[in-house]
């Protein structure tokens, strides 16, 4: 996906529209390309599908693009801010879109498209077209000095942990690891961000999460040199 996005961005640079619009087009086209490539999978291509949450970081912007119920959360100071909105079949606008196409949302262990899929957008899952679509939602957030980290995770984490709890865990562990690193006390080769991701994953497993658990944490604070390296 990274290479596809880079190609689409390079293609959009020469189009002459505003930078936000270029990103929207580049990301949407990238998701469409990824969706098209799913049909090349040898085994049951119509049944293969995935969510996706993409983050592009610049010096002043956080750009997100998501399809499905993987989520991007920003820890900013003491706040925890969801930068994406899960695309669920019972979300009012998604429900209206599905029903306008002749689809149905059935409650079967939660709201599901035709009682099958618990998300309303995805890459793949072509057997549920045109109700489940690979069209991402794109957001733009201006960075601030208070930004601590991003948590990018699949629903295996969010099913058992709220945004606020995940943010609290991340802040607490980041502060502790950074302080220890600054004092030269951490020598396990694990970055503060990786330590947070590992910890969140362990919590989800400990709570018997039943879904895929994929967690990425991005440290948004500039690296500080330890006293020995100053």
Positions of the model-derived regions?
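PP2C/PPM-type serine/threonine phosphatase catalytic domain
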Residues: 1-230
């Amino acid at each position: 996906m990274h290479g596809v996005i880079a190609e689409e961005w390079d293609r959009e640079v020469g189009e002459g529209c505003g930078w936000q619009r270029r990103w929207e087009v580049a990301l949407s086209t990238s998701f469409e390309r990824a969706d098209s490539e799913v049909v090349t999978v040898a085994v049951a291509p119509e049944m293969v599908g995935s969510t996706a949450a993409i983050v592009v970081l610049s010096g002043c912007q956080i750009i997100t693009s998501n399809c499905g119920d993987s989520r991007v959360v920003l820890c900013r100071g003491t706040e925890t801010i969801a930068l994406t909105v899960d695309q669920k079949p019972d979300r009012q606008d998604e429900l209206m879109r599905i029903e306008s196409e002749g689809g149905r949302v059935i409650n079967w262990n939660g709201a599901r498209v035709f009682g099958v899929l618990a998300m309303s957008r995805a890459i793949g899952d072509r057997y549920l077209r045109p109700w489940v679509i690979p069209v991402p939602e794109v957001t733009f957030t201006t960075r601030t000095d208070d930004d601590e980290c991003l948590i990018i995770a699949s629903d295996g984490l969010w099913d058992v942990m709220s945004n606020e709890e995940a943010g609290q865990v991340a802040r607490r562990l980041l502060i502790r690891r950074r302080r220890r690193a600054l004092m030269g006390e951490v020598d396990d080769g694990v970055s503060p961000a990786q330590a947070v991701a590992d910890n969140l994953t362990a919590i989800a497993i400990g709570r018997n999460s039943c879904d895929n658990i994929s967690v990425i944490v991005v440290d948004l604070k500039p690296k500080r040199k330890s006293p020995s390296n100053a």
